Amino acid sequence: MNGTRNWCTLVDVHPESQTAGSVDILRLTLQSELTGDELEHIAQKAGRKTYAMMPGHSSGHSLASELVESHDGHEEIIKVYLKGRSGDKMTHEKNIDQLKSEVQYIQEARNCLQKLREDISSKLDRSPGDPLRQQEIQVVLEKPNGFSQSPMTLYSSPPEVDPSMSEDVESLKKTVQELLVKLREAERRHQSDRVAFEVTLSRYQREAEQSNVALQREEDRVEQKAAEIEELQRRLLGMEAEHQALLVKVREGEMALEELRIKNADCQTEREKSAALEKEVAGFREKIHHLDDMLKSQQRKVRQMIEQLQNSKAVIQSKDATIQELKEKIAYLEAENLEMHDRMEHLIEKQVSHGNFSTQARAKTENLGSVRISKPPSPKPMPLIRVVET
């Protein structure tokens, strides 16, 4: 930054053939009066530790760096080589974005200082005075950093400073400092709001994952119950077929017994055979009665399985509704976060462009903080269907 003596230019150089284990180059263009502590403070904003080796400032740290003089002689360029890891790529990109935003803010301050120089030049053009004095002030204003590097001046006597110009410069410095303080406060508030939204979003994501796990368990249980129901139905069909076969045998035995009674009423052998047939028929009847009991029991079990299956389906539908509701909440929070981010960017641009936003920023920030999240209406639960045995 050439507009003021307390700033620097940060450039992140990425070669086209950069690999995962290559070295990142961070170039800092400093004024000659910039100290090592100020350089370290600027480097810490980017998430890295930078040690500047300036003349007259000793440092005990060892870091690959290169000190280069600029072409015009007003600046010193320190190239600091930072070893980056492939796993920290996203963090590096985030730090680069922060550096770009800070450079943008510095550029805006530089534009303000350039505008102040133009205003002072226009005032000097309008006000009559000593042409040599105006020429000296014009030479000072046209310098890239706004001050002379050489200790010698144009005249042997110390120059007189215009009080109005000094007051304008002081007021501009105070305004820039106030703007930076308010901007940092807005960024801190935005960071806290973003952290709160991220915590809420992570909580909803955990709830959604838990709901998905519970839903998967319910689906597995329903599949198991369905397999058991199919097995019971298969057994039930087999018992019904056996029941029909036994009924046919009973009818045949009764018919044979009746024929024997008609044909051989007086024959003992026939009586014994008839008694044996009667015993067999009695045994068949007991088996039929037992099969009827088993059939009714299996039917009750099937009805209970069907009822449990329907209840499980109702639970699954309610879980699906809960998951959908959580997804809608997540989408709503993401939309609110994006909207708040856009509003903050618009507010920052508006505040920097106009320079008068103390009350408006506070009111808009309070309005942004009061975000209401409306819960979407939950779907009605499915009715519970119970099978009644008749």
UniProtKB/Swiss-Prot annotation:
GO terms for molecular function: structural constituent of skin epidermis. It is found in: Secreted. Keywords: Biomineralization, Coiled coil, Secreted. Ameloblasts, and also non-odontogenic tissues including kidney, lung, liver and testis. Residues 356-383 are annotated as: Disordered. Residues 88-126, 163-352 form a coiled coil. GO terms for cellular component: cytoplasm; extracellular region. InterPro entries: Tuftelin_GRINL1A/MYZAP/CCD68 (IPR051375). The keyword Cell membrane does not apply. Interacts with TFIP11. May form oligomers. Involved in the structural organization of the epidermis. Involved in the mineralization and structural organization of enamel. Belongs to the tuftelin family. This is Tuftelin. It comes from Mus musculus.
